[in-house]
């Protein structure tokens, strides 16, 4: 990891975290500046409201919680606060460990997020060795069509451009734990579906425990292995930390966050904050307000994502 500077991590950690999902990143996009949002649907709210709006809808559903200083039972300080111990959060924690960055991973649940036994990476060496190649232009267009043009194409580009490097990084870690990480050469024939022409890119990477994998690691999921990795370096996930709000300075820069814990409110002060909390698919009110098309025609009802990260970052 010598070629990755501390600054490059803090400005682009989501690029590494992106390998954790097949084609997307956990977490929410940062609030955009007025220049970036010129001509878009996001715009400033009426003067004095302190809210960003999407159309006529406040991005923050309700007022920001007001927590008195006297209600804070503990204050922590760190260089990097990672909010959420799911796919993106744990990948970021491992990279921060490698770079020697002081960090806190705050997770509201009692365990790291679940993972599958595969992920997607674009044009990795193993793909070329199998005589295949991902058509990135076609894949980019397929993803945009699949999401009705509403996905963040900047995130897709990060995955298209950088997932191969991240795959090499993840593969080394998994291999050291006794896992065989292999490209599925039977996938990605370039077409699929019934009665339609659907592009299926060769991107699937599987990982399974080798015969020589130590028993204590053989049944662990990727994020559990990542947790063990950071534990061995003296770090741990802070569980039972439910995000209440982000804290900011007078200029509006994020300075950390306040969490609700069983002991009371805890303020984590951080020079840098990385939001890896997931989306809001399990919050019907927010879905109706911000993404009514998805709410009207849901593809899945199994999500457990509620909006603390998106809510707080709005």
Where are these regions (language model features)?
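Conserved redox-cofactor binding core of oxidoreductases
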Residues: 161-265, 284-285
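Conserved N-terminal glycine-rich FAD pyrophosphate-binding loop of Rossmann-like flavoproteins
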Residues: 109-131
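N-terminal Rossmann-like FAD-binding beta1-loop-alpha1 element of flavoenzymes
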Residues: 80-104
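Glycine-rich active-site loop/strand segments that organize a redox cofactor
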Residues: 123-159
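Proteins synthesized as precursors that undergo proteolytic processing into mature forms
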Residues: 101, 110-114, 314
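Glycine-rich loop(s) and the adjacent beta-strand/alpha-helix scaffold that form part
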Residues: 272-314
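Extreme N-terminal leader/targeting segments of oxidoreductases
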Residues: 2-79
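Core beta-strand elements of the Rossmann-like FAD/NAD(P) dinucleotide-binding domain
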Residues: 76-78, 263-272
